[in-house]
Regions:
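Extended non-membrane alpha-helical scaffolds
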Residues: 4, 29, 51, 80-83, ...
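C-terminal, helix-dominated tail/subdomain
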Residues: 265, 272-274
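A short beta-sheet element
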Residues: 112-113, 131-189, 195-200, 206-210
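Non-catalytic DNA-recognition/assembly elements of restriction-modification systems
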Residues: 2-42, 62-95, 220-266
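Short coil/turn segments at secondary-structure boundaries
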Residues: 57, 62, 97-105, 194-197
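A short glycine-rich beta-alpha junction/loop motif
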Residues: 1-15, 161-168, 198-224
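Sequence-specific dsDNA recognition surfaces
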Residues: 66-69, 85-100, 107-140, 162-163
Length: 274
């Protein structure tokens, strides 16, 4: 059986195109890690260590900033202590097997833990009816919290999909996404330990654990100053994730077409790509 192959030079050009795409989203992944680490470091400096710049540009706590007693210990004067569930809504997803699309009905891919981990849906993702309640539809930029099994908090940038059970969509009409996201990330290690302690069942957390997880609300003035940094970083991460998804889609679409010869790379007389 003879299998036709494109000319060697054409194969090399195709391989170069695909490897360039791979390199591009690997670079984006590395940039995202740096941005995430930067955002978390700034958040910890301001909201955990209380070393945000005072009026003179000096670290607040170590420069003698006024502190008051609270249930969390000493905190900056004027700050409030609240439960994690007081700053955001945690919407649990649906048992999507009950919402399968009917024949010829528009559908959405279902967001499960697998999809959250890989950052996108794929051809193996389950489908759900597009007629589910709007609040269960996930869009780019939504904060998703896997609270059972593999605990994970991430910014979803994999396109529109349906929210499956065991996942929270975390939203707030009181605070910016960066603020809600960073506090959820801050408490994630604690949630993982709580889940691990449930040895007889699949590890998970309860809503009471959200209430017991405390957050600090600064003054409006300081909140706005922090937002100048955090909002910018949050949006950079989100847009970079969206670009990674698009690059992966281009690669996955090109690969079988280049391999099959459906798409040919034009070469000039010297055998180079034209």
């Amino acid at each position: 059986l003879l299998i036709p192959y494109p000319p060697l030079e054409e194969q090399k050009v195709s391989a170069h195109i695909l490897s360039t795409l791979d390199e591009k989203f690997e670079v984006n992944n590395q940039i995202n890690k740096v941005l995430e680490n930067m955002a978390q470091a700034i958040f910890k400096q301001w909201f955990v260590d209380f070393e945000f710049p005072n009026e003179d540009g000096e670290p607040y706590k170590s420069s003698g900033g006024e502190m008051v007693e609270s249930e969390l210990g000493m905190i900056p004067k004027g700050w409030e202590v609240k439960g994690l569930d007081e700053i955001a809504e945690f919407l649990n997803g649906l048992a999507m097997q009950k919402y399968r699309p009917t024949e010829n009905e528009k559908s959405y891919p279902v967001l499960k833990i697998k999809e959250l981990r890989q950052g996108r849906t794929d051809e193996n993702s389950d489908l759900c009816s597009s007629n589910i309640e709007k609040k269960y539809i996930v869009r780019d930029g939504d904060i998703i919290f896997s609270w059972s099994g593999s605990l994970l908090v991430d910014i979803w940038c994999g396109g529109k999909c349906g929210l499956n059970q065991h996942l929270f969509k975390v939203t707030s009409d009181k605070h910016d996404q960066w603020f809600v996201y960073q506090w959820n990330k801050y408490h994630l290690d604690r949630f993982v330990n709580i889940a691990k302690s449930k040895a007889t069942t699949m590890g998970h957390i309860k809503r009471k654990d959200l209430s017991d997880s405390k957050v600090l609300i600064p003054s409006d003035e300081l909140y706005l100053k922090a937002a100048q940094y955090q909002k910018y970083l949050f949006e950079k991460i989100m847009y970079s994730k969206i670009e990674i998804k698009r690059l992966e889609e281009i690669r996955d679409s090109l690969l079988p077409k280049l391999m099959s010869g459906e798409i040919r790379v034009p070469l000039n007389e010297e055998g180079d790509a034209s």
